[in-house]
Curated annotation (Swiss-Prot):
Protein's name in the database: Casparian strip membrane protein 6
Glycosylation sites: 50, 142
Segments on the Cytoplasmic side according to the record's topology features: 1-23, 95-106, 182-186
Family indicated by similarity: Belongs to the Casparian strip membrane proteins (CASP) family.
Gene Ontology biological process: cell wall modification; cell-cell junction assembly
Function: Regulates membrane-cell wall junctions and localized cell wall deposition. Required for establishment of the Casparian strip membrane domain (CSD) and the subsequent formation of Casparian strips, a cell wall modification of the root endodermis that determines an apoplastic barrier between the intraorganismal apoplasm and the extraorganismal apoplasm and prevents lateral diffusion.
Membrane topology: Multi-pass membrane protein
Principal cellular location given in the protein's record: membrane
Keyword terms of this UniProt record: Cell membrane, Cell wall biogenesis/degradation, Glycoprotein, Membrane, Transmembrane, Transmembrane helix
Cellular localization per UniProt: Cell membrane
Residues annotated as transmembrane: 24-44, 74-94, 107-127, 161-181
Extracellular side: 45-73, 128-160
Amino acid sequence: MKAGPIELGEGKSSAPKAAVNRGVAILDFILRILAFIGTLGSAISMATTNETLPFFTQFIRFRAEYDDLPTFTFFVVANGVVSAYLLFSLPFSIFNIVRSKAQNSRILLIILDTAMLGLLSAGASAAAAIVYLAHQGNVRTNWSAICQQFNSFCERISGSLIGSFIGVVVFILLISLSAVALSRHK
C-alpha cells in the first residue's frame, strides 16, 4: 500500500473540528459572562441614578430620577431581563463546552440570543435618544438641555449606556460564533 499526499478536504478532520468547536464554546462562555457583567452593571447604574438640585428652597426642589422617564424604566427592565437570561444561559454554554457536538442547545441559544439582542438594542437605543436630548436639548421643540444643571445624573445615565451597547456587540458575536459552530457540524 502506497501512502500518498493528503489532499485538501481529506484526512483526520474530526479531532481538529472538535477542538475548534470546544474553543468556540469556551469563547462563548467567556463572552456570556462579559455581557452579563455589562448589562447588569448598566441596569444597576441606571436604576440607582438620581440627583437633587441644591439651590432651591425647602418647598421647591428639582429632582431627576431614572424613573421620571418611561424610556429609562424600559432600559432598566430590558437590561435586567437580558442579564437574567445570560445568567440562565450559562449552563447551556457549559454543556456546549462538555459536548462540543451538541446542536440542539446551540440552535436554542441562537434563537434566544437573537430575541435578547432585539430587546437589548431597543432599550439601549431608546435610552440613547433621551440621553442625547438631555445633553443637547432640542431648539425646535423648546426642550432645553438639562445636563448643565444635573451633572452627575447625566454622567451616570451616559455611562450606563456603555455597558448596554457592549452587550449588544457581544450578542452579535455570540450569534456569529454559534452560527460558525453549527456550520462546522456538517
